[in-house]
Amino acid sequence: MRRTAISLTLASLLVSSASWAVVHPGVDLTDRYIVVLKKDASPNAAQQVLAAIENQRGAVLFRYQHTLQGFAVQMPLTALQGLQHRFPDIDYIEPDLAVQAMPRGGNKPNNGDSGTSTEPPQTTPWGIKRVGGFVDMSGDDARAWIIDTGIDDKHPDLNVDARSGRNFSRGKPNQTSDGNGHGTHVAGTVGAINNAMDVVGVAAGVTVVPVRVLDNAGSGTISGVIAGVDYVAEAAASGDCANLSLGAKGYSQALDTAIKTAADAGILFSIAAGNSADDASLYTPASTVHPNVYTVSAIDNNDNFAYFSNYGSDVEYAAPGVSVLSTKAGGGTVTYNGTSMAAPHMCGVLLVTRGQPSMSGYAEGDPDGNPDPIVHQ
């Protein structure tokens, strides 16, 4: 059932505290496709396909070399199908689709904004406490790769390695700042510094690396997400964690392959289950199954299963995803809701436990009747 024809509606998996939104439909990008070569295709064969695409005035948007061999291209499908007949090393072609982040109206900013703050110098959010508290990982070699909207590298509560970051969205390759806020919030839950200000993350002070695949409006493409995963596979080390708080309805074989290949190299993945109150197996990358890949549903502070959260057999753990306080782009903190917020709790625990998470209790009211264990250190 998971392997249905692709019909993608990628969105940053965050729910407004005022309106519990669901995924918005993606818009097909005319003449944009993902071309994947067979595993045993030689570098020379890949170069021949690339040259043929360029000779037919096709635009190569991304080239994938670390998790799979292939390209994201813009050219008519009929021309691509002609190339597929000419080059048997082409395994399959799938459409690239536009994606859009969810609205976030109604989220409440906290300290760091104008006016007198009533917050203590540093808050330990309820979600951090629920998964076992924070562990100081300042100076640790492990890193968290935030595949998202970028990260505010000037936020004083985050240890951001912007130099190792990359941009696969609009702008220059090294433009990884966050004009949206989603990625900065995710990064804070993973690793906000224990420094007597704002909040503290699960893996406090761990280095967070921005891999920008969504623009300032929260929009992106499946091809850009694959490019982000492909880069992480090249740059990350075994034991690092990549967080994917995004999702799409349907199945992308290329994205699934990219994640599994990176996971084979020891990179841990934490993936949001989705906010559509639906079976997570119908969404990508939530449906990716691998020992180093963890799909995460959301609970509230009473361990109740969040009614917006996706569910099902592809979900490994539940984590806090309602009224989650974390870092805000531009400084200070803000509260968000969504499985986007649950996944970084998991990522932090994976870093702290070196990929050996535990559990503490179960989500109450899981719609599939098989309650998800709540992740814990």
Which residue stretches match the model-derived regions?
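Short pre-catalytic strand/loop immediately N-terminal to key active-site residues, enriched for Gly-Thr
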Residues: S169-N180, V211, D215, F305, ...
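C-terminal subdomain of the subtilisin-like protease fold in secreted/lumenal serine endopeptidases
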Residues: L61-L68, V200-A203, P210, G224, ...
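Extracellular S/T/G-rich loop segment that most often corresponds to the catalytic His/Ser-adjacent loop
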Residues: R143, D148, I267, Y283-Q377
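N-terminal signal peptide c-region/cleavage motif recognized by signal peptidases
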Residues: S16-A18
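Structural recognition of the beta-strand scaffold that forms the well-ordered cores
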Residues: Y33-V36, A72, E94, R143-I146, ...
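Active-site core segment of subtilase-fold serine proteases
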Residues: D91, K108-T207, G224-A227, E234-D240, ...
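Autoinhibitory propeptides
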Residues: V23-T30, K38-P43, Q47-T123
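Solvent-exposed loop/turn segments at secondary-structure junctions
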Residues: D40-S42, L68, T78-L80, L97-A101, ...
